[in-house]
Structures are given as structure tokens and as C-alpha cells.
A protein has these predicted regions:
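A polyanion-binding, active-site-adjacent surface
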Residues: 1-94, 98-102, 107, 117, ...
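Short, flexible loop segments at boundaries between secondary-structure elements
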Residues: 110-147
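A charged, well-structured terminal subsegment
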Residues: 146-156
Length: 156
């Protein structure tokens, strides 16, 4: 299971609620072509090609524009996430980014938990520090594969 904070839309609307999959992975163009989202699917493919089933979920279940989430809403999303994890019952949890990492730690889910920097383009500086080179798709995927190998037995 991968838990991450989906990149937020630049066009918030309080009048319309949008539904979709995390990182727009329901959309073939977003999975394969769109430079802002294809990296996420490429990272997931590393796991899929090794026989893992992957469940990706967004930390925040509803996009809220503006100043941010109220503490009460964050707590609600944490409870929904806890129930989601209990329902899915994953072998391990991967988190992308500090917010997802903190959320998993806070709700005290007792599964193997492996934290990785959020792979978004906006996190390029942190990714560069972690992978030790330019954060291109290829370099991030190579590092992700090496990172996962000892943690998830990628010999499958």
C-alpha cells in the first residue's frame, strides 16, 4: 500500500467537489504521457512488474482549497485512513512525503512502514539530496528500485 498526499489543484473551487483517483491514475494519458503524473505510475510499475499488488491512496480524501485543513478534518481523514488500512490489510505501507509519514506514525498502524520522499517535481531539491543526483524520472526510478529491494524482497 502506498499512502501519499496528492498534488493539489491550482484551481480550487468551493462550489464544486471533484472526484477522481489519486494522481489521476484512472486516466491513461496521465499515467503515460503527462509529465506531472507519469512518474507516479512508473514507480508503481516497479512493484507491479515484480508481482506485488499495489493499493494507492490519498492522505486527504477530499481536496480542500485555501488556507488548509482544520485540525478536526485532519483527524477525520486520519480515522478514515486507519479504517482503509485495516480493510485492505497490506503487507507493508510505503509513504511518499513527510505528511503521509507523520499520518501513518500518528495513527499507530502496526505494519512494516517504509518512508520515501514525495516523488513530485515540486520536491526536486529533497529528492536530489536523497538520491544524490539530478531528480530525473530515470534516476528516481532507479533509486526507488534500489531502495525497495532490501525492504520488500524484490526478488519476486
Amino acid at each position: 500500500m502506498i499512502v501519499a498526499l496528492d498534488a493539489l489543484s491550482k484551481e480550487p473551487s468551493l462550489d464544486h467537489v471533484r472526484f477522481g483517483t489519486p494522481f489521476a491514475l484512472h486516466n491513461k494519458w496521465c499515467r503515460e504521457k503527462y509529465f506531472r503524473t507519469r512518474r507516479y505510475f512508473q514507480l508503481i510499475e516497479v512493484l507491479l512488474h515484480r508481482g506485488f499488488k499495489v493499493y494507492l491512496t490519498d492522505l486527504y480524501k477530499i481536496y480542500v482549497g485555501g488556507a488548509g485543513l482544520l485540525k478536526e478534518d485532519k483527524n477525520r481523514f486520519g480515522e478514515v485512513l486507519r479504517e482503509e488500512i485495516e480493510l485492505i490489510n497490506p503487507e507493508a505501507i510505503m509513504t511518499w512525503g513527510k505528511k503521509a509519514e507523520r499520518a501513518i506514525t500518528k495513527i499507530k498502524i502496526y505494519r512494516p512502514h517504509h518512508a520515501y520522499p514525495h516523488p513530485s517535481g515540486a520536491n526536486g531539491r529533497q529528492l536530489s539530496k536523497v538520491i544524490g543526483c539530478s531528480p530525473t524520472d530515470e534516476n528516481i526510478i532507479d533509486h526507488w528500485t534500489q531502495y525497495l529491494a532490501p525492504r520488500l524482497s524484490l526478488q519476486r
